Amino acid sequence: MHLQSRLTALRRYPASTNQETQHMPKFSTLEIDKDLQNPRVARLLLNRPERLNAISEDMPGEIRAAVEWANADDEVHVILIEGAGKGFCGGYDLAGYAEQHIEHPCQQEKTPWDPMVDYACMKRYTEDFMTLWKSAKPTIAKVHGAAVAGGSDIALCCDLLVMAEDARIGYMPTRVWGCPTTAMWTFRLGPMRAKQMMFTGDVIDGRTAAEWGLATMAVPAQELDAAAMTLASRIAGVPRSHLAMHKMVVNQVMLNMGVEQTQMMATVFDGITRHNPEGLWFRRHAQEHGFKSAIEWRDSGRPIPEGDEARALIREIDARAGGRS
């Protein structure tokens, strides 16, 4: 997201913490407001339902701005994050990037890949998501449908996770063309389960997430909103200072374990996965056959072309594309 866009988003609400003068912010990718029944709960709605709430360039910075707004309001004690429409968040809005020949810090076609420009872009998004984790006020992700790929980054940066039993969570791009930059899986699941998720790119449902300890609870879909609000309201009865102190103590353990250093490595590796032979093959396949075909191959369990095989396939695809031009 461009700096000017982020500054514009931050200017949409005043810096004052006076509740009478602080207005509800307006965003292009999400909404935030206080719950009508319990104004101690701020409800942050990812609001791109026509794209399964996919992450656009504006969304990470708007999440940061919304969290900062909620933290500045003394009435708010807890932030509940949810998605409009059929699911929580389907990940980054990548179809256009994968299928088209465009110049972007995270996809450079005509010029050599600049890893530091790529890193700066993705690190900014990661830091935006991490405002949910760093927020002085507890954050709860309420997940229905799917929280996958980058959507799982948003969910796992929240302090607590409440899922519908049939909802799904996972990071499929670990098979090719991605590495979760927030690196939260190990801290939320432990090394063995995290490795299983990263090695397979599989998704799990809400029931399994609760059994594994990834989700705080999993409930039938029709009970999800009530369960999430019951938990949020229970938390909202605790003084803000106590919530902030307890959160700081737990977060400090993760900081001592190296969460920030791990995120730096994961963000570097994410850029590499998009520009190594395997990542370039994935993108060329999407450009020739469409993004849907590419992700169907990725998720099918078929071996991903690698190394020299991937390079040879890239040359073949480029030759066919040259013949059609």
What are these regions (language model features)?
Residues 86-89, 148, 250-253:
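Short, active-site-adjacent cap segments at secondary-structure transitions
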Residues 7-10, 18-40, 205-206, 226, ...:
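C-terminal alpha-helix plus adjacent terminal tail
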Residues 58-62, 124, 131, 227, ...:
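Charged catalytic carboxylate motif
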Residues 44, 48, 62-63, 81, ...:
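Terminal peptide-recognition signature
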Residues 83-127, 290-293:
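Glycine- (often His-adjacent) and acidic-residue-rich active-site loop
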